[in-house]
């Protein structure tokens, strides 16, 4: 899940980035901060190009010609089930969300740092749970990666390729911005759907995320700049 932050106070914006990055790293959630900016139009442009569900943390009072609530209303046109969270120091402005019919997940008051951190994490947990529920309805395709006592849910679109691990019965999922080791086997993963193809004894690739293929060297390059290898027999089948 991609996370967007629109906050015109640089210190506050950096604080939110730190809170979210630490949460993602510690909890190993399939999330990333796609954009942190003071420009609402940059966020809106990203929302227009979204092909999955986003999570948006928006300051209500921005130093531009568009406020956070109006931005949320515009985002709704392109990401109707996205998670919109307003961050503000002005509780009296929350009524505007009903005027604009934004359907916000939460309002976080940023004057209390401890409360800010707790509420941001609560929102991320809720957004993650919603994503899992939507995936059960086939709205978003995800896979459960089992890591012993816990699991991580990852969207198909975030997967570059799977690789066999040096550890027995384990694989490594190469995602857009990180790697996850989990229990599984490549044969099952190659049968998820047509986009996943076993190009080598050690690799299953996501065809949708391939940038290019060097057929001579049998190297597959991905959108995140990683690469893997293909066998002589399978390189032309990718």
UniProtKB/Swiss-Prot annotation:
<comment type="function">
    <text>Required for high-level post-exponential phase expression of a series of secreted proteins.</text>
</comment>
<dbReference type="InterPro" id="IPR011006">
    <property type="entry name" value="CheY-like_superfamily"/>
</dbReference>
<keyword id="KW-0902">Two-component regulatory system</keyword>
<keyword id="KW-0963">Cytoplasm</keyword>
<feature type="domain" description="Response regulatory">
    <location>
        <begin position="2"/>
        <end position="125"/>
    </location>
</feature>
<keyword id="KW-0010">Activator</keyword>
<dbReference type="Pfam" id="PF00072">
    <property type="entry name" value="Response_reg"/>
</dbReference>
<dbReference type="GO" id="GO:0005737">
    <property type="term" value="C:cytoplasm"/>
</dbReference>
<keyword id="KW-0597">Phosphoprotein</keyword>
<keyword id="KW-0238">DNA-binding</keyword>
<feature type="domain" description="HTH LytTR-type">
    <location>
        <begin position="143"/>
        <end position="238"/>
    </location>
</feature>
<dbReference type="InterPro" id="IPR007492">
    <property type="entry name" value="LytTR_DNA-bd_dom"/>
</dbReference>
<feature type="modified residue" description="4-aspartylphosphate">
    <location>
        <position position="59"/>
    </location>
</feature>
<protein>
    <recommendedName>
        <fullName>Accessory gene regulator protein A</fullName>
    </recommendedName>
</protein>
<dbReference type="InterPro" id="IPR046947">
    <property type="entry name" value="LytR-like"/>
</dbReference>
<dbReference type="Pfam" id="PF04397">
    <property type="entry name" value="LytTR"/>
</dbReference>
<dbReference type="InterPro" id="IPR001789">
    <property type="entry name" value="Sig_transdc_resp-reg_receiver"/>
</dbReference>
<keyword id="KW-0804">Transcription</keyword>
<keyword id="KW-0805">Transcription regulation</keyword>
<dbReference type="GO" id="GO:0003677">
    <property type="term" value="F:DNA binding"/>
</dbReference>
<dbReference type="GO" id="GO:0000156">
    <property type="term" value="F:phosphorelay response regulator activity"/>
</dbReference>
């Amino acid at each position: 899940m991609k996370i967007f932050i629109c906050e015109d106070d640089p210190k506050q914006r950096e604080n939110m980035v730190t809170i979210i990055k630490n949460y993602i790293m510690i909890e190993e959630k399939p999330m990333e901060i796609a954009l942190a900016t003071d420009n609402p139009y940059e966020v809106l442009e990203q929302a227009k190009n979204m092909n999955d569900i986003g999570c948006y943390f928006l300051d209500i009072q921005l130093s531009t010609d568009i406020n956070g609530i109006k931005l949320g209303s515009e985002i709704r046109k392109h990401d109707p089930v996205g998670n919109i969270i307003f961050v503000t120091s002005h509780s009296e402005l929350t009524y505007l969300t009903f005027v604009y019919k934004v359907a916000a997940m939460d309002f976080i008051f940023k004057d209390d740092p401890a409360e800010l951190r707790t509420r941001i994490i609560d929102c991320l947990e809720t957004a993650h749970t919603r994503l899992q529920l939507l995936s059960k309805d086939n709205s978003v395709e995800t896979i459960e990666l089992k890591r012993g006592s816990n699991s991580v849910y990852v969207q198909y679109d975030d997967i570059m390729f799977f690789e066999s691990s040096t550890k027995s019965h384990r694989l490594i999922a190469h995602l857009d911005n990180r790697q996850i080791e989990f229990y599984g086997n490549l044969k099952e993963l190659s049968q998820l759907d047509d986009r996943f193809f076993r190009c080598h004894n050690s690799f299953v690739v996501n065809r949708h995320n391939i940038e290019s293929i060097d057929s001579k060297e049998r190297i597959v390059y991905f959108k995140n700049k990683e690469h893997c290898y293909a066998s002589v027999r399978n390189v032309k089948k990718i």
